[in-house]
C-alpha cells in the first residue's frame, strides 16, 4: 500500500451532520434576531470553520461571529451533535482498513471534545488511533492547522499519510502540509470543487475509497 496513515475528516465524510448543524444555525439566527434561512442554504456551513463562515456568509463582524458561535453551541452542544447519522457502511469500511494494516486518525475542524463525543456515541471511536480537532477557543480551526497538529503530535510522515475529506478545505489543508487528499463525493463538496482544489483522487462511495486506500 502507498499510504500507512489515513486522516479522516468527520462532517460529510464519516457522518452526515446536516440536521444538527442546520438546527443549531437556525437557533443562532433566532437568537441574533435574523430571518431564519431555508435549511438547504445552510449546507455551506458544513465543513469549514464556523467563525470565518459566519463572517463570509452572513456578513458578520468578528465580534458578531463570536456571539453567533456562542448561540450555535447552545443548541449543538446539547442536542445538535447527536442529530447526526453515520454514513451507511462506514463502520465496516473502517474495520476493513484497520485490518489491512492502515493506521486511522480523525482530523476535523470541529472542536475536539465534541468530535470525541460524536465518535463515541456512534461507536466509531474504536477504529481510530487518535482524534485531532479544533480548539474550543478557536485558536486552531483551519484545516491546515489541524492537519499540522496531527502530523506533529502523532509523528506522522507526510509522505506516508493521506487526507480523506469532502470539501475543498480538506484538500487545501492537506496540500499545505505536503499530503495527498482523496475527495469523497457522497458528502457536501462537488466533483468540481474538489478537483479545482487539487484532490489527488476522487471516490464516489466507500467501496471506491477503500480500494484507493488499499492500493
Residue ranges and their predicted role:
Residues 28-29, 49-62, 118-121, 150-151:
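Helix-loop "lid/cap" segments that line or gate small-molecule binding pockets
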Residues 125-139:
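A short, structured active-site edge motif that brings together acidic residues
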Residues 35, 61, 125-129, 157, ...:
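Conserved H-loop
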Residues 55-92:
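Metal-dependent phosphoesterase signature
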Residues 5, 142-171:
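Conserved Lys-Pro-Asp/Glu-containing loop-to-beta segment of HAD-superfamily phosphomonoesterases
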Residues 25, 90-119:
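Substrate-recognition element of Asp-dependent hydrolases with the DxDx(T/V) motif
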Residues 162-203:
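Acidic, Mg2+-coordinating phosphoryl-transfer loop and its flanking beta/alpha structural elements
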Residues 1-44, 58-59:
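Active-site neighborhood of HAD-like aspartate-dependent phosphohydrolases
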Amino acid at each position: 500500500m502507498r499510504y500507512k496513515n489515513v486522516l479522516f475528516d468527520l462532517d460529510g465524510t464519516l457522518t452526515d451532520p446536516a440536521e444538527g448543524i442546520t438546527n443549531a444555525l437556525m437557533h443562532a439566527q433566532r437568537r441574533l434576531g435574523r430571518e431564519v434561512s431555508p435549511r438547504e442554504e445552510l449546507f455551506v456551513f458544513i465543513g469549514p470553520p464556523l467563525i470565518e463562515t459566519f463572517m463570509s456568509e452572513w456578513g458578520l463582524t468578528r465580534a458578531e461571529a463570536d456571539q453567533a458561535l456562542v448561540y450555535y453551541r447552545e443548541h449543538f452542544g446539547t442536542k445538535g451533535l447527536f442529530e447526526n447519522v453515520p454514513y451507511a457502511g462506514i463502520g465496516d469500511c473502517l474495520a476493513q482498513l484497520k485490518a489491512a494494516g492502515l493506521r486511522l486518525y480523525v482530523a476535523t475542524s470541529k472542536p475536539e471534545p465534541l468530535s470525541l463525543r460524536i465518535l463515541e456515541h456512534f461507536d466509531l471511536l474504536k477504529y481510530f488511533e487518535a482524534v485531532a480537532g479544533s480548539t474550543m477557543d478557536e485558536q486552531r480551526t483551519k484545516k491546515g492547522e489541524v492537519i499540522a497538529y496531527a502530523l506533529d503530535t502523532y509523528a506522522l510522515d507526510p509522505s506516508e499519510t493521506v487526507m480523506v475529506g469532502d470539501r475543498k478545505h480538506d484538500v487545501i489543508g492537506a496540500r499545505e502540509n505536503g499530503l495527498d487528499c482523496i475527495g469523497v463525493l457522497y458528502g457536501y463538496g462537488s466533483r468540481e470543487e474538489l478537483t479545482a482544489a487539487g484532490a489527488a483522487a476522487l471516490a464516489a462511495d466507500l467501496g471506491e475509497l477503500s480500494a484507493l486506500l488499499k492500493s
